[in-house]
């Protein structure tokens, strides 16, 4: 009996999920704290689950409608099987499940992190990062498992139909694309809905509570404080989990599609079907193997994240996270050498380069492409950390500019976000050019797969942020001793940066994934290139560039509408419920949670529908070349807007933290009561851009 190599990534994904269950059990075994802490944590979890359940019920209708549409497509498109439908449905379920796993463990870990902080900072870090690890491994494990199982099933179903290897594999990969489509569809709505919820609650809690009433962040007297903490979970945990799940799956799938074209190129060159010890599928299997080994590398990397000093500051905590990240990257890189040597021929003969004929590419060039991808993943995090971290020049510049009021605060923050696009875009440009020269579009796709291989680690670091933020909220609302909040604030401050770097990684992954998908699209449609001298193609390019702008506008408008209702509700409660500000009466937390939930569910639909419908209309009305131009416009504009918004928001966030800790402006130490204009400028601008 021949060994089927597809079992290797299946086993690796199951190992990741097994470790996830072990880590989740360990987190839940930790002390959740006193009765008040447990009550607050339960309220946050209840609100988050209520939102997710309502969101998933709404998305169920979308899944049903999309499934019917896919069935219709399968009847008229020869290469599309009806089996794309179960793949689509399972992809949607797995995407939702990935976000749900992360959200549940995050809400379990928050009070446990707070309780651990009563003992020591190192223990609090272990609990918070343990919760993040569960989320990261859940996303990566489910993605690799789902792709591998469906690929194995479709191989058995379609590869013996009598056609050519290339034609049969095209049917397999088109059916597998349903899994990616389901994942990306849920990710879109989860990210938008979670983001609207988060920012609406944030504005209400901060502007009325902190600025107008002058009470601290996460103070139990603030009616919006539970909604604010719920938002951290549904947006930055569940939303981010679904987001990276979709990007992860899309990257691996695009690489597999391009691997099929590489096999066709080699077969055409040799005038016979390419063969290898893996059923002639080595180039297709490589991205799955890289993803699988990345899970193990991430697990090993998490073991190195620890601090020993209870007096450690932000720099030591950040250094610990960076160490674990670097170790996971190096293990992935080392493994890629052996995987490429194992799965690819020594030379890829006849690889097509658009407009340049064919080249013979040594397999080590593909390994060099993985170096490019892993370097991009690390450097984009480093660039984001520089622009958003406490004590770095960009944040200090915003702090200093706040001395003259709100206007200069906003100007400095906007300028920081805009400047930050330079280094990231230059990095992307060099990476795209370098990976393409090394291995064509397949090299670009494999570089993206290598970068995404450490998704489990990146998500663990990212989820650590909102867990730490919630832990600080639980400490404040439970009125614990000052040193507990100081310890959670250290983790929260680092978490602000890791949240920004996590989004930076998501942006980088989206950029390289978009290019890999674009390459797969161009190759699949058979168009020779995109000629912008054609009027319809140029028009589509401009439309594509406009979509991220209008998407951002709609999202911000939605946040504004929801935030206005939240602000009015918080003001109403302060006015109509006697004793709230004196701590003698309990606010109506559920009302604020309800406002954010209803607003997010209602307002997420229009941006999502525009994003899905526009390319369909462009494709049918203007043709495949114009659609390719549209995709290029979306990719370029979207990356620029995402980098700007992410880094401006992260820098403002840590500028606020600087004020709260006490900073020197013009030789004078100023703290969180620095002035109404400082906080007003920060809160308005940050919530606007984030």
Stretch-by-stretch model annotation:
Residues 1-680, 686-689:
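Hydrophobic packing and interface segments
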């Amino acid at each position: 009996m021949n060994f089927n190599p597809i079992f290797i990534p299946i086993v690796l994904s199951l190992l990741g999920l097994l470790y996830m269950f072990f880590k989740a059990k360990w987190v839940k075994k930790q002390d959740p704290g006193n009765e008040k802490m447990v009550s607050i944590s339960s309220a946050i979890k209840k609100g988050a689950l209520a939102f997710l359940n309502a969101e998933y019920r709404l998305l169920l209708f979308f899944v049903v409608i999309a499934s019917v549409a896919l069935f219709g497509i399968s009847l008229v498109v020869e290469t599309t099987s009806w089996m794309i439908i179960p793949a689509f449905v399972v992809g949607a379920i797995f995407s939702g499940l990935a976000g749900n796993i992360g959200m549940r463990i995050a809400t379990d870990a928050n009070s446990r992190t707070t309780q651990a902080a009563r003992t020591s900072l190192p223990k609090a870090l272990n609990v918070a990062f343990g919760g993040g690890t569960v989320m990261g491994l859940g996303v990566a494990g489910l993605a690799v498992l789902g792709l591998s199982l469906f690929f194995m099933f479709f191989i058995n179903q379609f590869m013996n139909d009598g056609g050519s290897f290339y034609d049969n594999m095209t049917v397999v990969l088109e059916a597998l694309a349903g899994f990616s489509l389901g994942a990306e569809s849920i990710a879109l709505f989860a990210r938008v809905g979670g983001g609207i919820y988060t920012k609406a609650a944030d504005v209400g809690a901060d502007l009325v509570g902190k600025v107008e009433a002058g009470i601290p962040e996460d103070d139990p007297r603030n009616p919006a404080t539970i909604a604010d903490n719920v938002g951290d979970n549904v947006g930055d945990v569940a939303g981010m989990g679904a987001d990276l799940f979709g990007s992860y799956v899309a990257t691996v799938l695009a690489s597999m599609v391009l691997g099929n074209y590489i096999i066709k190129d080699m077969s055409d060159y040799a005038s016979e079907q390419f063969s290898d010890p893996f059923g002639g599928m080595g180039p297709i299997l490589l991205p799955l193997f890289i993803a699988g080994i990345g899970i193990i590398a991430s697990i090993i990397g998490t073991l190195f994240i620890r601090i020993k000093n209870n007096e450690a500051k932000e720099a030591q905590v950040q250094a610990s996270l960076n160490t674990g990240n670097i170790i996971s990257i190096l293990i992935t890189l080392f493994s890629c050498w052996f995987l490429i040597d194992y799965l690819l021929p020594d030379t890829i003969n006849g690889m097509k380069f658009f407009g340049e004929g064919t080249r013979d590419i040594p397999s080590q060039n593909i390994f060099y492409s993985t170096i490019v991808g892993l370097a991009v993943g690390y450097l984009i995090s480093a660039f984001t950390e520089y622009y958003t971290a406490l004590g770095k020049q960009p944040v200090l510049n915003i702090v200093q500019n706040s001395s003259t009021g709100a206007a200069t605060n906003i100007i400095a923050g906007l300028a920081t976000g805009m400047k930050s696009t330079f280094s990231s875009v230059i990095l992307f440009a060099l990476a795209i050019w370098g990976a393409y020269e090394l291995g064509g579009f397949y090299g670009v796709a494999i570089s993206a797969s290598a970068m995404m291989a450490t998704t489990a680690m990146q998500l663990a670091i990212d989820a650590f942020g909102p867990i730490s933020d919630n832990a600080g909220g639980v400490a404040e609302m439970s009125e614990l001793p000052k040193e507990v909040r100081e310890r959670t604030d250290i983790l929260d401050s680092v978490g602000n940066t890791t949240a920004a770097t996590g989004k930076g990684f998501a942006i980088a992954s989206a950029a390289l994934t978009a290019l890999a998908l674009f390459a797969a699209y161009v190759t699949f449609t058979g168009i020779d290139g995109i000629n912008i001298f054609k009027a319809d193609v140029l028009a589509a390019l401009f439309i594509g560039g406009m979509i991220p702008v209008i998407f951002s506008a709609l999202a911000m408008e939605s946040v504004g509408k929801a935030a206005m209702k939240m602000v009015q509700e918080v003001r109403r409660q302060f006015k109509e419920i006697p004793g709230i500000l004196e701590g003698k009466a309990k606010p109506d937390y559920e009302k604020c949670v309800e406002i954010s939930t209803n607003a997010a569910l209602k307002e997420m639909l229009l941006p999502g529908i525009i994003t899905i419908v526009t390319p369909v209309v462009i494709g049918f009305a203007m043709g495949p070349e114009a659609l390719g131009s549209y995709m290029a416009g979306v990719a370029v504009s979207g990356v620029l807007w995402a980098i700007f918004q992410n880094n401006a928001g992260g820098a403002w966030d840590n500028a606020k933290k600087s004020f709260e800790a006490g900073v020197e402006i013009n030789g004078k130490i100023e703290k969180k009561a620095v002035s109404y204009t400082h906080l007003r400028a920060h809160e308005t601008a940050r919530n606007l851009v984030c």
